[in-house]
Amino acid sequence: MTDKTSNQMWGGRFAAGPDAIMEAINASIGFDKRLAAQDIAGSRAHAAMLAATGVITDSDAEAIREGLLTVLSEIEAGEFTFSTALEDIHMNVEARLKEIIGEPAGRLHTARSRNDQVATDFKLWVRDQFDAAEAGLLALLRALLGQAEAGADWVMPGFTHLQTAQPVTWGHHMMAYVEMFGRDLSRVRDARARMNESPLGSAALAGTSFPIDRHMTAAALGFDRPTANSLDAVSDRDFALEFLSVASICAMHLSRFAEELVIWSSAQFRFVTLSDRFSTGSSIMPQKKNPDAAELIRAKVGRIFGANTALMMVMKGLPLAYSKDMQEDKEQVFDAADNWMLALAAMEGMVRDMTANRDSLAAAAGSGFSTATDLADWLVRVLGLPFRDAHHVTGALVALAESKGCDLPDLSLDEMQSAHAAITEDVYGVLGVENSVNSRQSYGGTAPAQVRAQVARWKEMLA
Protein backbone atom coordinates (compact mmCIF):
# COMPACT_ATOMS: atom_id res chain seq x y z
CA MET A 1 0.00 0.00 0.00
CA THR A 2 1.50 3.37 -1.00
CA ASP A 3 1.15 6.85 0.50
CA LYS A 4 -1.19 9.22 -1.36
CA THR A 5 -0.18 12.82 -2.02
CA SER A 6 -3.78 13.93 -1.87
CA ASN A 7 -6.76 12.38 -0.22
CA GLN A 8 -8.90 10.59 -2.77
CA MET A 9 -11.72 10.09 -0.24
CA TRP A 10 -12.72 13.76 -0.02
CA GLY A 11 -10.43 15.64 -2.42
CA GLY A 12 -12.87 16.19 -5.28
CA ARG A 13 -13.60 19.83 -4.52
CA PHE A 14 -9.97 20.71 -3.80
CA ALA A 15 -7.52 21.93 -6.44
CA ALA A 16 -4.43 20.96 -4.43
CA GLY A 17 -3.40 18.49 -1.79
CA PRO A 18 -2.87 19.58 1.81
CA ASP A 19 0.32 21.22 3.04
CA ALA A 20 2.67 18.90 4.89
CA ILE A 21 1.92 20.71 8.15
CA MET A 22 -1.82 20.37 7.52
CA GLU A 23 -1.34 16.68 6.83
CA ALA A 24 0.62 16.27 10.05
CA ILE A 25 -1.88 18.05 12.28
CA ASN A 26 -4.84 16.40 10.56
CA ALA A 27 -3.62 12.81 10.70
CA SER A 28 -4.74 10.55 13.53
CA ILE A 29 -3.58 7.21 12.15
CA GLY A 30 -0.63 7.22 14.54
CA PHE A 31 -3.03 6.45 17.38
CA ASP A 32 -6.45 5.54 15.98
CA LYS A 33 -5.01 2.48 14.25
CA ARG A 34 -5.80 0.86 17.58
CA LEU A 35 -9.42 0.92 16.40
CA ALA A 36 -8.67 -1.29 13.38
CA ALA A 37 -10.52 -4.38 14.59
CA GLN A 38 -13.54 -2.33 15.65
CA ASP A 39 -13.53 -0.38 12.38
CA ILE A 40 -13.52 -3.57 10.33
CA ALA A 41 -16.23 -5.15 12.49
CA GLY A 42 -18.43 -2.09 11.97
CA SER A 43 -17.81 -2.10 8.23
CA ARG A 44 -18.67 -5.78 7.94
CA ALA A 45 -21.94 -5.25 9.80
CA HIS A 46 -22.71 -2.19 7.66
CA ALA A 47 -22.03 -4.03 4.38
CA ALA A 48 -24.19 -6.99 5.40
CA MET A 49 -27.03 -4.61 6.27
CA LEU A 50 -26.69 -2.71 2.98
CA ALA A 51 -27.05 -5.99 1.11
CA ALA A 52 -30.00 -7.14 3.24
CA THR A 53 -31.85 -3.89 2.53
CA GLY A 54 -31.05 -3.95 -1.19
CA VAL A 55 -28.78 -0.92 -1.15
CA ILE A 56 -25.85 -2.93 -2.54
CA THR A 57 -25.75 -6.35 -4.17
CA ASP A 58 -24.99 -9.56 -2.34
CA SER A 59 -21.93 -10.09 -4.51
CA ASP A 60 -20.53 -6.68 -3.60
CA ALA A 61 -21.23 -7.34 0.07
CA GLU A 62 -19.41 -10.68 -0.12
CA ALA A 63 -16.43 -9.08 -1.85
CA ILE A 64 -16.34 -6.40 0.84
CA ARG A 65 -16.56 -9.01 3.61
CA GLU A 66 -13.71 -11.10 2.20
CA GLY A 67 -11.61 -8.04 1.48
CA LEU A 68 -12.05 -6.72 5.00
CA LEU A 69 -10.95 -10.05 6.43
CA THR A 70 -7.81 -9.81 4.31
CA VAL A 71 -7.14 -6.30 5.58
CA LEU A 72 -7.62 -7.44 9.17
CA SER A 73 -5.21 -10.34 8.73
CA GLU A 74 -2.61 -7.98 7.26
CA ILE A 75 -2.96 -5.61 10.21
CA GLU A 76 -2.76 -8.42 12.76
CA ALA A 77 0.32 -9.83 11.02
CA GLY A 78 2.04 -6.44 11.00
CA GLU A 79 2.07 -6.38 7.19
CA PHE A 80 -0.18 -3.34 6.72
CA THR A 81 1.41 -0.02 5.75
CA PHE A 82 -0.44 2.86 7.39
CA SER A 83 -0.53 6.16 5.52
CA THR A 84 -0.64 9.57 7.18
CA ALA A 85 -1.91 11.03 3.89
CA LEU A 86 -5.05 8.95 4.40
CA GLU A 87 -5.50 10.56 7.83
CA ASP A 88 -7.18 7.88 9.88
CA ILE A 89 -7.98 4.21 10.30
CA HIS A 90 -11.23 4.47 8.33
CA MET A 91 -9.61 5.79 5.16
CA ASN A 92 -6.58 3.54 5.50
CA VAL A 93 -8.80 0.47 5.64
CA GLU A 94 -11.03 1.63 2.79
CA ALA A 95 -8.08 2.49 0.55
CA ARG A 96 -6.50 -0.91 1.09
CA LEU A 97 -9.86 -2.57 0.53
CA LYS A 98 -10.09 -0.82 -2.84
CA GLU A 99 -6.64 -2.10 -3.77
CA ILE A 100 -7.80 -5.64 -2.96
CA ILE A 101 -11.34 -5.77 -4.41
CA GLY A 102 -11.59 -2.74 -6.65
CA GLU A 103 -14.84 -0.90 -7.38
CA PRO A 104 -17.11 -2.61 -4.77
CA ALA A 105 -15.02 -0.98 -2.03
CA GLY A 106 -16.44 2.38 -3.07
CA ARG A 107 -19.94 1.18 -2.16
CA LEU A 108 -19.07 0.43 1.47
CA HIS A 109 -19.43 4.04 2.61
CA THR A 110 -22.99 4.32 1.27
CA ALA A 111 -25.36 5.63 3.97
CA ARG A 112 -22.45 6.18 6.33
CA SER A 113 -20.19 9.04 7.41
CA ARG A 114 -16.92 8.97 9.25
CA ASN A 115 -18.85 10.76 11.98
CA ASP A 116 -21.03 7.76 12.85
CA GLN A 117 -18.25 5.37 11.86
CA VAL A 118 -15.75 6.70 14.39
CA ALA A 119 -18.40 6.97 17.10
CA THR A 120 -19.22 3.31 16.52
CA ASP A 121 -15.58 2.21 16.46
CA PHE A 122 -14.78 4.15 19.61
CA LYS A 123 -17.82 2.82 21.46
CA LEU A 124 -16.88 -0.74 20.57
CA TRP A 125 -13.35 -0.16 21.85
CA VAL A 126 -14.48 1.48 25.08
CA ARG A 127 -16.99 -1.30 25.64
CA ASP A 128 -14.17 -3.84 25.40
CA GLN A 129 -12.22 -1.83 27.96
CA PHE A 130 -15.16 -1.80 30.34
CA ASP A 131 -15.21 -5.60 30.03
CA ALA A 132 -11.48 -5.74 30.75
CA ALA A 133 -11.93 -3.47 33.77
CA GLU A 134 -14.71 -5.70 35.07
CA ALA A 135 -12.44 -8.74 34.82
CA GLY A 136 -9.62 -6.87 36.57
CA LEU A 137 -11.88 -5.70 39.37
CA LEU A 138 -13.31 -9.17 39.90
CA ALA A 139 -9.80 -10.60 40.24
CA LEU A 140 -8.83 -7.86 42.70
CA LEU A 141 -11.98 -8.35 44.75
CA ARG A 142 -11.30 -12.07 45.05
CA ALA A 143 -7.73 -11.42 46.16
CA LEU A 144 -8.97 -8.98 48.82
CA LEU A 145 -11.58 -11.46 50.02
CA GLY A 146 -8.84 -14.06 50.43
CA GLN A 147 -6.86 -11.67 52.62
CA ALA A 148 -9.96 -10.68 54.61
CA GLU A 149 -10.99 -14.26 55.26
CA ALA A 150 -7.50 -15.29 56.39
CA GLY A 151 -7.20 -12.34 58.77
CA ALA A 152 -10.78 -11.95 59.97
CA ASP A 153 -9.65 -11.96 63.62
CA TRP A 154 -6.16 -10.47 63.30
CA VAL A 155 -6.10 -7.25 65.31
CA MET A 156 -4.44 -4.14 63.96
CA PRO A 157 -4.68 -0.42 64.61
CA GLY A 158 -7.32 1.57 62.81
CA PHE A 159 -6.27 5.10 61.96
CA THR A 160 -7.68 8.57 61.55
CA HIS A 161 -5.28 11.34 60.48
CA LEU A 162 -2.75 8.47 60.29
CA GLN A 163 -2.89 8.47 64.10
CA THR A 164 -3.97 5.44 66.09
CA ALA A 165 -7.74 5.57 66.55
CA GLN A 166 -9.36 2.24 67.49
CA PRO A 167 -8.43 -1.41 67.09
CA VAL A 168 -9.84 -3.11 64.02
CA THR A 169 -9.10 -6.37 62.28
CA TRP A 170 -7.04 -6.99 59.18
CA GLY A 171 -10.12 -8.55 57.64
CA HIS A 172 -12.17 -5.44 58.35
CA HIS A 173 -9.59 -3.22 56.67
CA MET A 174 -9.46 -5.47 53.61
CA MET A 175 -13.25 -5.49 53.43
CA ALA A 176 -13.25 -1.68 53.35
CA TYR A 177 -11.44 -1.94 50.01
CA VAL A 178 -13.80 -4.68 48.88
CA GLU A 179 -16.65 -2.21 49.35
CA MET A 180 -14.78 0.52 47.45
CA PHE A 181 -13.81 -1.66 44.51
CA GLY A 182 -17.25 -3.24 44.61
CA ARG A 183 -18.76 0.18 43.95
CA ASP A 184 -16.27 0.60 41.12
CA LEU A 185 -17.47 -2.70 39.66
CA SER A 186 -21.05 -1.47 39.87
CA ARG A 187 -20.11 1.77 38.12
CA VAL A 188 -18.32 -0.14 35.35
CA ARG A 189 -21.36 -2.31 34.72
CA ASP A 190 -23.77 0.61 34.90
CA ALA A 191 -21.76 2.78 32.50
CA ARG A 192 -21.30 -0.10 30.06
CA ALA A 193 -25.04 -0.72 29.97
CA ARG A 194 -25.78 2.97 29.41
CA MET A 195 -23.35 3.33 26.50
CA ASN A 196 -24.49 0.19 24.66
CA GLU A 197 -26.41 1.95 21.87
CA SER A 198 -25.22 1.94 18.27
CA PRO A 199 -24.49 5.23 16.46
CA LEU A 200 -24.01 3.42 13.14
CA GLY A 201 -26.42 4.68 10.48
CA SER A 202 -26.66 8.18 11.94
CA ALA A 203 -24.47 9.28 9.01
CA ALA A 204 -23.01 12.79 9.19
CA LEU A 205 -25.64 14.13 11.59
CA ALA A 206 -29.13 13.96 10.03
CA GLY A 207 -29.53 10.29 9.24
CA THR A 208 -29.78 8.99 5.67
CA SER A 209 -32.32 8.72 2.86
CA PHE A 210 -31.30 5.12 2.14
CA PRO A 211 -33.63 2.40 3.50
CA ILE A 212 -31.15 1.11 6.06
CA ASP A 213 -31.89 -1.09 9.08
CA ARG A 214 -30.07 0.34 12.08
CA HIS A 215 -31.52 -2.29 14.38
CA MET A 216 -29.82 -4.96 12.27
CA THR A 217 -26.36 -3.40 12.55
CA ALA A 218 -26.87 -2.68 16.25
CA ALA A 219 -27.67 -6.34 16.91
CA ALA A 220 -24.78 -7.55 14.76
CA LEU A 221 -22.34 -5.48 16.81
CA GLY A 222 -23.75 -6.51 20.18
CA PHE A 223 -25.49 -3.24 20.96
CA ASP A 224 -28.84 -3.26 22.75
CA ARG A 225 -30.43 -0.78 20.33
CA PRO A 226 -29.55 2.04 17.94
CA THR A 227 -29.23 5.56 19.28
CA ALA A 228 -32.50 7.50 19.13
CA ASN A 229 -31.18 10.81 17.76
CA SER A 230 -28.69 10.98 14.90
CA LEU A 231 -27.45 14.44 15.85
CA ASP A 232 -26.70 13.39 19.40
CA ALA A 233 -25.16 10.11 18.25
CA VAL A 234 -22.33 11.74 16.31
CA SER A 235 -21.85 14.58 18.81
CA ASP A 236 -21.72 12.38 21.89
CA ARG A 237 -18.58 11.45 23.77
CA ASP A 238 -20.33 10.94 27.09
CA PHE A 239 -19.40 7.27 26.95
CA ALA A 240 -15.70 8.17 26.81
CA LEU A 241 -16.07 10.78 29.54
CA GLU A 242 -17.96 8.34 31.72
CA PHE A 243 -15.29 5.72 31.11
CA LEU A 244 -12.66 8.20 32.29
CA SER A 245 -14.80 9.25 35.26
CA VAL A 246 -15.33 5.66 36.36
CA ALA A 247 -11.64 4.97 35.81
CA SER A 248 -10.70 8.04 37.84
CA ILE A 249 -12.79 7.04 40.86
CA CYS A 250 -11.40 3.53 40.77
CA ALA A 251 -7.89 4.89 40.28
CA MET A 252 -8.33 7.06 43.35
CA HIS A 253 -9.15 3.93 45.36
CA LEU A 254 -6.13 2.18 43.89
CA SER A 255 -3.94 5.12 44.84
CA ARG A 256 -5.18 5.21 48.43
CA PHE A 257 -4.50 1.51 48.82
CA ALA A 258 -1.12 1.85 47.14
CA GLU A 259 -0.20 4.59 49.61
CA GLU A 260 -1.10 2.33 52.53
CA LEU A 261 0.96 -0.52 51.08
CA VAL A 262 3.96 1.79 50.73
CA ILE A 263 3.60 2.81 54.38
CA TRP A 264 2.78 -0.65 55.70
CA SER A 265 5.71 -2.32 53.96
CA SER A 266 8.24 0.13 55.42
CA ALA A 267 10.64 -0.93 58.17
CA GLN A 268 8.90 1.53 60.49
CA PHE A 269 5.57 -0.31 60.19
CA ARG A 270 6.29 -3.88 58.98
CA PHE A 271 2.56 -4.55 58.66
CA VAL A 272 2.97 -6.33 55.34
CA THR A 273 5.69 -8.02 53.35
CA LEU A 274 5.34 -7.55 49.61
CA SER A 275 6.49 -10.43 47.47
CA ASP A 276 9.72 -10.22 45.52
CA ARG A 277 7.63 -10.48 42.36
CA PHE A 278 6.15 -7.03 42.98
CA SER A 279 9.18 -5.27 44.46
CA THR A 280 12.48 -3.96 43.13
CA GLY A 281 15.94 -3.29 44.53
CA SER A 282 18.43 -0.45 44.56
CA SER A 283 21.47 -0.07 42.30
CA ILE A 284 23.58 1.14 45.24
CA MET A 285 21.91 0.01 48.49
CA PRO A 286 21.95 -3.80 48.68
CA GLN A 287 19.45 -4.00 51.52
CA LYS A 288 16.64 -2.19 49.74
CA LYS A 289 13.35 -3.80 48.74
CA ASN A 290 11.25 -1.06 47.23
CA PRO A 291 7.45 -1.12 46.78
CA ASP A 292 7.77 0.22 43.24
CA ALA A 293 4.59 -1.39 41.93
CA ALA A 294 2.56 0.47 44.55
CA GLU A 295 4.42 3.71 43.90
CA LEU A 296 3.91 3.44 40.15
CA ILE A 297 0.20 2.77 40.61
CA ARG A 298 0.05 5.94 42.68
CA ALA A 299 1.80 7.88 39.89
CA LYS A 300 -0.22 6.43 37.02
CA VAL A 301 -3.39 7.58 38.71
CA GLY A 302 -2.33 11.14 37.93
CA ARG A 303 -2.31 10.31 34.23
CA ILE A 304 -5.83 8.93 34.47
CA PHE A 305 -7.05 12.04 36.29
CA GLY A 306 -5.32 14.18 33.66
CA ALA A 307 -7.01 12.33 30.81
CA ASN A 308 -10.41 12.89 32.39
CA THR A 309 -9.79 16.61 32.71
CA ALA A 310 -8.28 16.88 29.22
CA LEU A 311 -11.27 15.33 27.47
CA MET A 312 -13.68 17.49 29.43
CA MET A 313 -11.74 20.51 28.18
CA VAL A 314 -11.85 19.25 24.59
CA MET A 315 -15.62 18.81 24.67
CA LYS A 316 -16.74 21.77 26.75
CA GLY A 317 -17.12 24.34 23.95
CA LEU A 318 -18.17 22.30 20.94
CA PRO A 319 -21.40 23.10 19.10
CA LEU A 320 -23.35 20.21 17.59
CA ALA A 321 -22.54 18.10 15.71
CA TYR A 322 -19.01 16.93 14.91
CA SER A 323 -15.95 19.15 15.15
CA LYS A 324 -12.39 18.10 14.41
CA ASP A 325 -11.56 18.81 18.04
CA MET A 326 -13.15 15.45 18.78
CA GLN A 327 -10.22 13.72 17.09
CA GLU A 328 -8.36 14.53 20.32
CA ASP A 329 -10.64 12.24 22.34
CA LYS A 330 -8.90 8.94 21.72
CA GLU A 331 -5.35 9.36 22.94
CA GLN A 332 -6.61 10.37 26.37
CA VAL A 333 -8.83 7.33 26.63
CA PHE A 334 -6.22 4.96 25.21
CA ASP A 335 -3.62 6.11 27.72
CA ALA A 336 -6.01 6.06 30.65
CA ALA A 337 -7.28 2.60 29.76
CA ASP A 338 -3.76 1.20 29.41
CA ASN A 339 -2.73 2.58 32.78
CA TRP A 340 -5.96 1.57 34.52
CA MET A 341 -5.72 -2.03 33.36
CA LEU A 342 -2.06 -2.21 34.32
CA ALA A 343 -2.74 -0.70 37.74
CA LEU A 344 -5.57 -3.15 38.41
CA ALA A 345 -3.39 -6.10 37.44
CA ALA A 346 -0.47 -4.87 39.54
CA MET A 347 -2.66 -4.29 42.58
CA GLU A 348 -4.27 -7.70 42.26
CA GLY A 349 -0.83 -9.31 42.09
CA MET A 350 0.44 -7.42 45.12
CA VAL A 351 -2.63 -8.25 47.20
CA ARG A 352 -2.62 -11.89 46.16
CA ASP A 353 1.06 -12.37 47.00
CA MET A 354 1.55 -10.11 50.03
CA THR A 355 1.86 -11.44 53.57
CA ALA A 356 0.27 -9.64 56.49
CA ASN A 357 2.60 -9.73 59.51
CA ARG A 358 0.20 -10.74 62.24
CA ASP A 359 2.60 -10.12 65.13
CA SER A 360 3.48 -6.62 63.96
CA LEU A 361 -0.18 -5.80 63.45
CA ALA A 362 -1.07 -7.03 66.93
CA ALA A 363 1.82 -5.19 68.58
CA ALA A 364 0.72 -1.94 66.99
CA ALA A 365 -2.97 -2.50 67.71
CA GLY A 366 -2.74 -1.62 71.39
CA SER A 367 -0.43 1.34 71.06
CA GLY A 368 -1.52 4.95 71.02
CA PHE A 369 -4.32 4.38 73.57
CA SER A 370 -6.41 2.65 70.92
CA THR A 371 -8.96 1.37 73.45
CA ALA A 372 -9.71 4.81 74.93
CA THR A 373 -13.12 4.83 73.23
CA ASP A 374 -13.88 1.46 74.82
CA LEU A 375 -13.11 2.97 78.22
CA ALA A 376 -15.43 5.91 77.53
CA ASP A 377 -18.17 3.53 76.37
CA TRP A 378 -17.72 1.48 79.58
CA LEU A 379 -18.17 4.61 81.70
CA VAL A 380 -21.42 5.33 79.85
CA ARG A 381 -22.71 1.78 79.86
CA VAL A 382 -21.72 0.74 83.41
CA LEU A 383 -21.57 3.96 85.41
CA GLY A 384 -24.28 5.82 83.50
CA LEU A 385 -22.15 8.86 82.75
CA PRO A 386 -23.20 11.15 79.90
CA PHE A 387 -20.87 10.47 76.99
CA ARG A 388 -19.32 13.96 77.13
CA ASP A 389 -18.44 13.43 80.80
CA ALA A 390 -17.08 9.98 80.01
CA HIS A 391 -15.02 11.51 77.21
CA HIS A 392 -13.53 14.01 79.67
CA VAL A 393 -12.70 11.34 82.28
CA THR A 394 -11.09 9.14 79.66
CA GLY A 395 -9.06 12.06 78.33
CA ALA A 396 -7.73 12.69 81.83
CA LEU A 397 -6.69 9.04 82.15
CA VAL A 398 -4.98 9.14 78.74
CA ALA A 399 -3.04 12.21 79.86
CA LEU A 400 -2.05 10.42 83.07
CA ALA A 401 -0.87 7.32 81.21
CA GLU A 402 1.01 9.46 78.72
CA SER A 403 2.79 11.29 81.53
CA LYS A 404 3.81 7.94 83.06
CA GLY A 405 4.94 6.51 79.71
CA CYS A 406 2.50 3.59 79.89
CA ASP A 407 -0.72 2.39 78.26
CA LEU A 408 -4.19 2.55 79.78
CA PRO A 409 -4.26 -1.09 80.97
CA ASP A 410 -1.01 -0.40 82.90
CA LEU A 411 -2.66 2.18 85.17
CA SER A 412 -3.50 0.92 88.65
CA LEU A 413 -7.08 0.90 89.91
CA ASP A 414 -6.20 3.73 92.31
CA GLU A 415 -4.95 5.78 89.39
CA MET A 416 -8.12 4.99 87.46
CA GLN A 417 -10.24 6.07 90.42
CA SER A 418 -8.33 9.34 90.66
CA ALA A 419 -10.25 10.37 87.54
CA HIS A 420 -13.59 8.93 88.71
CA ALA A 421 -14.09 7.24 92.06
CA ALA A 422 -16.77 4.81 90.82
CA ILE A 423 -14.46 2.98 88.39
CA THR A 424 -14.09 -0.69 89.33
CA GLU A 425 -11.75 -3.57 88.50
CA ASP A 426 -14.14 -4.61 85.72
CA VAL A 427 -12.88 -1.76 83.57
CA TYR A 428 -9.77 -3.74 82.63
CA GLY A 429 -11.93 -6.20 80.75
CA VAL A 430 -12.63 -3.65 78.00
CA LEU A 431 -9.09 -2.37 77.60
CA GLY A 432 -7.71 -5.35 75.66
CA VAL A 433 -7.68 -4.99 71.88
CA GLU A 434 -9.23 -8.42 71.29
CA ASN A 435 -12.14 -7.57 73.56
CA SER A 436 -12.45 -4.25 71.79
CA VAL A 437 -12.80 -5.71 68.30
CA ASN A 438 -15.03 -8.54 69.48
CA SER A 439 -17.41 -6.02 71.02
CA ARG A 440 -17.99 -4.19 67.70
CA GLN A 441 -20.89 -6.42 66.70
CA SER A 442 -22.98 -3.76 64.98
CA TYR A 443 -23.75 -4.48 61.33
CA GLY A 444 -20.68 -3.62 59.30
CA GLY A 445 -18.48 -3.50 62.39
CA THR A 446 -15.01 -4.90 62.87
CA ALA A 447 -15.96 -7.91 65.02
CA PRO A 448 -14.60 -11.09 63.40
CA ALA A 449 -18.10 -12.55 63.15
CA GLN A 450 -19.24 -9.49 61.22
CA VAL A 451 -16.19 -9.64 58.96
CA ARG A 452 -16.79 -13.30 58.16
CA ALA A 453 -20.43 -12.59 57.41
CA GLN A 454 -19.45 -9.82 54.99
CA VAL A 455 -16.89 -12.06 53.31
CA ALA A 456 -19.55 -14.72 52.84
CA ARG A 457 -21.99 -12.16 51.44
CA TRP A 458 -19.47 -10.92 48.89
CA LYS A 459 -18.43 -14.41 47.88
CA GLU A 460 -22.05 -15.22 47.16
CA MET A 461 -22.45 -11.98 45.18
CA LEU A 462 -19.40 -12.74 43.05
CA ALA A 463 -20.13 -16.43 42.55
UniProtKB/Swiss-Prot annotation:
GO annotations of cellular component type: cytosol
GO BP annotations, alphabetical order: arginine biosynthetic process via ornithine; L-arginine biosynthetic process
Keyword Amino-acid biosynthesis: yes
Keywords recorded for this protein, A-Z: Amino-acid biosynthesis, Arginine biosynthesis, Cytoplasm, Lyase
The family this protein is said to belong to: Belongs to the lyase 1 family. Argininosuccinate lyase subfamily.
Name of the molecule in the record: Argininosuccinate lyase
Pathway(s) it belongs to: Amino-acid biosynthesis; L-arginine biosynthesis; L-arginine from L-ornithine and carbamoyl phosphate: step 3/3
Pfam family, one: Lyase_1
Enzyme class at the top of the EC tree: lyase
Catalysed reactions listed for this entry: 2-(N(omega)-L-arginino)succinate = fumarate + L-arginine
Main location: cytoplasm
Source organism, top-level taxon: Bacteria
CDD domains: Argininosuccinate_lyase
